[in-house]
Amino acid sequence: MSSKTLYDKVWDLHRIADLPGGATQLFVGLHLIHEVTSPQAFAALEEKGLSVNCPDRTIATVDHIVPTTNHQRPFSDPLAEEMLHTLEKNCSNHHIKLFGIGSGNQGIVHVMAPESGLTQPGMTIACGDSHTSTHGAFGAIAFGIGTSQVRDVLATQSLAMKKLKVRRIWVDGQLTNGVFAKDLILHVIRHLGVKGGVGYAYEFAGPAIKKLSMEERMTICNMAIEGGARCGYVNPDQTTFDYLEGKPYIPTGQEWESALQWWKELASDQNAIFDDEVKFDACKISPTVTWGITPGQAIGIDELIPKVDSLETSDQQTAREAYLYMNLHPGSSIEGLGIDVCFIGSCTNGRLSDLQAAAKIVKNRHVAKGIKAFVVPGSEKVAKAAEAEGLDVLFQNAGFEWRKPGCSMCLAMNPDRLEGNQISASSSNRNFKGRQGSARGRTLLMSPAMVAAAAISGSVTDVRNLINQGP
């Protein structure tokens, strides 16, 4: 009887050859590219007179540098315009499909690919972007890669990699009202650490994971990388199949039935052997907010910022840096901390269900005076669906700005930036020093609903209080 994990099965199916030194040459089923990490890779191909090996397995979009206030070309930033022009030229020269602005398909790469049905169970997926682990929500093994590896995949449709260990993260129970997938993954990273997953793939499993929607699973897998894991995944199940059926790139008819039969065999075997297992109880997780300069520096909304002597010795120096940079004091509450900017979007939380969750909090309320709040849909499809529901009008009536799709303030490679020492409540995935554009800007990570609550109150607020009040 087989005792393999999904990771083992997908790895074995894509193994081309074992290499000296313990690495494996692995076939890449889908290669996603964008404007930031691909130009140098294409230039390297041209220098060697090489062409793209499998253009039909390569899909491009533009996301990082896109201004979200206006998509009109040329962009006001000449560097951004040059980067997009270069991507367009490279895709044209190598016959690669580009989901460009106005195509109806453009969006953040990790939002665009799943909603189009490009991401499928059992695939190996690579992209020159840290949060490629998002696609693991479908039972794929997805890796973020560097520019030199982007070059290698373009040239050979393969990667040299060492096999990871697998840690199962088992989550019992069910998330309570006002607690979301973002809270769950911040809770996991808080307890396992930002380096706890180094050398591992994370398999997310258990009753609480089973109950999550596909978009919630994407949030979980998206941030596996923030816990040090190279990838994260969820076993495909009926929730997965229901989400995929009818998507543009999903097979139909007999091909769908055949795919479905194969996908059902991919899940980790009942007696699969894991290298490690950690258990959590979803019922004990509360709305969670980061207070420091790593995603692991997080606490429940009802907790106090930890004192340095309560932390592991290895975490104490980073905590001291965080207190100083964030201008926060150990032993104080994060609830009530004033906010300057509220950002809802990103590849972590820029999907339709994220906007719907925030909209429920915003309905019949208004952004607090002096707060800059904006919503950035993760893709053109998300924007269209949200606008069909009237969410754009709801947010704008409440004092939010409704923007065009793009990565926006997640990483500030575009005009959306913090200024000075502003504090943002952000639904993105990283709170590093200077991450959102200002060298002194401060980022608090939280769920979209918590960001909405912060926008309404003007400070970090327990979203459950607003839920209990009703709209």
Swiss-Prot record:
One GO biological process term: L-leucine biosynthetic process
Enzyme class: lyase
Pathway this chain belongs to: Amino-acid biosynthesis; L-leucine biosynthesis; L-leucine from 3-methyl-2-oxobutanoate: step 2/4
Domain of life, source organism: Bacteria
Protein name from the UniProt record: 3-isopropylmalate dehydratase large subunit
Cofactor(s) annotated in UniProt: [4Fe-4S] cluster
NCBIfam families xrefs: leuC (TIGR00170), PRK05478.1 (NF004016), PRK12466.1 (NF009116)
Keywords for this protein: 4Fe-4S, Amino-acid biosynthesis, Branched-chain amino acid biosynthesis, Iron, Iron-sulfur, Leucine biosynthesis, Lyase, Metal-binding
Pfam families in UniProt: Aconitase (PF00330)
Annotated binding of [4Fe-4S] cluster, by residue: C347, C407, C410
Reaction catalyzed: (2R,3S)-3-isopropylmalate = (2S)-2-isopropylmalate
